UniProtKB/Swiss-Prot annotation:
Tissue: Retina. Localized to the photoreceptor neurons, both in the compound eyes and ocelli.
Summary of the knockout phenotype: Lethal during the late embryonic to early larval stages. Hypomorphic mutants are viable but male adults are sterile, whereas female adults remain fertile. Impairs spermatid individualization showing abnormal mitochondria morphology and defects in lipid compositions and lipid-mediated signaling. RNAi-mediated knockdown results in low insulin pathway activity and defective cell growth in certain tissues. Various non-adipose tissues display excessive fat accumulation such as the salivary glands, proventriculus, hind gut, Malpighian tubules and trachea.
GO terms classed as biological process: CDP-diacylglycerol biosynthetic process; G protein-coupled opsin signaling pathway; lipid biosynthetic process; negative regulation of triglyceride biosynthetic process; phototransduction; positive regulation of phosphatidylinositol biosynthetic process; regulation of lipid storage; sperm individualization
PANTHER family (alphabetical): PHOSPHATIDATE CYTIDYLYLTRANSFERASE, PHOSPHATIDATE CYTIDYLYLTRANSFERASE, PHOTORECEPTOR-SPECIFIC
Family: Belongs to the CDS family.
Pfam family, one: CTP_transf_1
Role description: Catalyzes the conversion of phosphatidic acid (PA) to CDP-diacylglycerol (CDP-DAG), an important precursor for the synthesis of phosphatidylinositol (PtdIns) and phosphatidylglycerol (PG). Required for the regeneration of the signaling molecule phosphatidylinositol 4,5-bisphosphate (PtdInsP2) from PA and maintenance of its steady supply during signaling thus playing an essential role during phospholipase C-mediated transduction.
Transmembrane residue ranges: 88-108, 147-167, 180-200, 203-223, 227-247, 276-296, 350-370
Region annotation (Disordered) ranges: 1-49
EC number of this enzyme: 2.7.7.41
Name of the protein: Phosphatidate cytidylyltransferase, photoreceptor-specific
Length: 447
């Protein structure tokens, strides 16, 4: 039994009130479970008050649009106004995406890096408000330093992997290739020591929380962008198709939800409906099959990006692999005595489309939960009707990871061109040893 003394007035005596621990717990649980319970300022716990105060300082997403668009749509209801705005900027982004694809792999890699930096800035700005409130030293500088270090490591890994032969031929860059991982580790250790030296008494817990915040942000955006670039080098189709599937699912789920949505899907995103989720899923599978069939006809999209020693440059020409060579499939299983010619990649595209439509949206739900925790509408307002860059790429990062794992598990086979690149990086005597071993082994096999 716990006694709670309550003073009714300044001159009134103390009143002893006995409250059982179990009753108090039940009251707290019922209050927490009540969906319509709203805490008063006095009832709010310190953490809730802190989040409320923090939310006032965070950059809130807005629905601002260009004035010319506002004036043109002023007579429309808000629901249809938002529909038109989202539609216009969706098509603008699709056209921009097409132009970047036309620019080739280098344009895609630069765009990936820029998107990554912007996403990191949007996430870290929330933590930066915590830094400003508490006066924590060096938080923003350390965050950007760790971003630079992480990019040096991951992008360097890609450069060494795909451009190692070219870089090794430049004398002053050879050192960076040979000791890339050691240099990356040394740069990280500098940041680590910098963080330790910046620790301030009273704020240890908060500083370590923000240190973790930065590293989780790096895990979300830098690691995923590294995987995206690996997917690009496997062939543009492994980048374009999954990205387009997420876009298609997002658009079609919005369309089906807008016209037919009645049943709420998840509390984290009240506007999401089962009708939109299911309709978007079917549309994505159909779109994935048709879009994949079109891209499979062009070497530009299906060939992996490799360095050609003969041509002395990176190439996107190849003999199409089994995945992109039409195969004959019998339809007897379905009671039809005919055959169908299909690219094997189409079957893989169905797996990708199912993931993008069933699991992909959970990347968006995760982001919605994060935004609700800090009581913000969007990560930013860079794209009218859509929010910030992170609001558009929350599902893309999850999809990129799946595609990378899918390729390494079910698709990737040893690449002769990549093996040659690694051999060219060896010393002449090591290359000669490999040559002799191959010669002897092949001789034994042929005799």
């Amino acid at each position: 039994m716990a006694e709670v003394r309550r003073r009714k007035g300044e001159d009134e005596p103390l009143e002893d009130t006995a409250i059982s621990g179990s009753d108090a717990a039940n009251k707290r649980n019922s209050a927490a479970d009540s969906s319509d319970h709203v805490d008063s300022e006095e009832e709010k716990i310190p953490e809730e008050k802190f989040v409320d105060e923090l939310a006032k300082n965070l950059p809130q997403g807005t629905d601002k649009t260009p004035e010319i668009l506002d004036s043109a749509l002023k007579d429309l209801p808000d629901r249809w106004k938002n529909w038109v705005i989202r539609g216009i900027f969706t098509w603008i982004m699709i056209c921009g995406f097409a132009l970047i694809i036309y620019g080739g792999p280098l344009a895609l890699m630069i765009t990936t890096l820029l998107v990554q930096v912007k996403c990191f800035q949007e996430i870290i700005s929330i933590g930066y408000q915590v830094y400003r409130i508490h006066g924590l030293p060096w938080f923003r500088s350390l965050s950007w330093y760790f971003l630079l270090t992480s990019n040096y490591f991951f992008y360097g890994e890609n450069l060494v992997d795909y451009f190692g032969v070219v870089i090794n031929r430049v004398e002053y860059l050879k050192f960076l290739v040979t000791y890339h991982r050691f240099l990356s580790f040394a740069l990280y250790i500098i940041g680590f020591v910098w963080f330790v030296l910046s620790l301030v008494k009273k704020y240890y817990i908060k500083q370590f929380s923000l240190f973790a915040w930065t590293h989780v942000s790096l895990l979300i955006v830098v690691t995923q962008s590294y995987l995206i670039i690996q997917n690009i080098f496997e062939g543009l189709i492994w980048f374009i198709v999954p990205v387009s599937m997420i876009v298609c699912n997002d658009v079609m789920a919005y369309v089906f939800g807008f016209f037919f949505g009645r049943t709420p899907l998840i509390k984290l995103s009240p506007k999401k409906t089962w009708e939109g989720f299911i309709g978007g899923g079917f549309a994505t599978v159909l779109f994935g099959i048709l879009f994949s069939y079109v891209l499979c006809n062009y070497q530009y999209f299906i060939c992996p990006i490799q360095y050609s020693e003969e041509q002395g440059r990176m190439t996107m020409s190849c003999v199409p692999s089994y995945l992109f060579t039409p195969q004959e499939y019998s339809l007897k299983l379905f009671g039809i005595g005919k055959t169908l010619n299909l690219y094997p990649f189409i079957w893989h595209s169905i797996s990708l489309s199912l993931f993008s439509s069933i699991i992909g949206p959970f990347g968006g739900f995760f982001a919605s939960g994060f935004k609700r925790a800090f009581k913000i509408k969007d990560f930013g307002d860079m794209i009218p009707g859509h929010g910030g860059i992170m609001d558009r790429f929350d599902c893309q990062f999850l999809m990129a990871t799946f595609v990378n794992v899918y390729i390494s598990s079910f698709i990737r086979t040893p690449s002769p061109a990549k093996l040659l690149t690694q051999i060219y990086n060896l010393k002449p005597d090591q290359q000669y040893q490999i040559y002799q071993s191959l010669k002897d082994n092949l001789g034994d096999m042929l005799t």
